[in-house]
């Protein structure tokens, strides 16, 4: 955190231990029905100086004050569980980068495009230092290559389970699987 704290005056900040359930409620005040949110994601092997430079540049060029870049560290148990034991394919220490561009006025197509482009450009700026794929919860089926890389060797096993337990693709709005879009392959 030290490099971030040297960037300037901290407007809002809190570092403390909390339960997982409590952490899930932290952003509730900012999740408002009717707003438009563009999301993107990538994984970094670590948050080093190159990643911090991209982070700072992204926020310097943010489309609005409602844009944000969050990081979540995956370490400890998240990297000790064997990849074949769960659906989650990346089982090494890494940092999840979550990119959000929020727009309250859904009628302004120019601003919508500007926010969408900022999210995309931010992820692309991380690309040279990013790991393949991204956090599956934040990916869309149209990004098939990144979806496939996110699940790694688990993809085929997950697709087989999907075919078996959801042959009618009832849960099609859930996390995308490689090759599973509107219908099953």
Regions inferred by a protein language model and the residue ranges of each:
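Soluble FAD-dependent oxygen oxidases
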Residues: 1-185
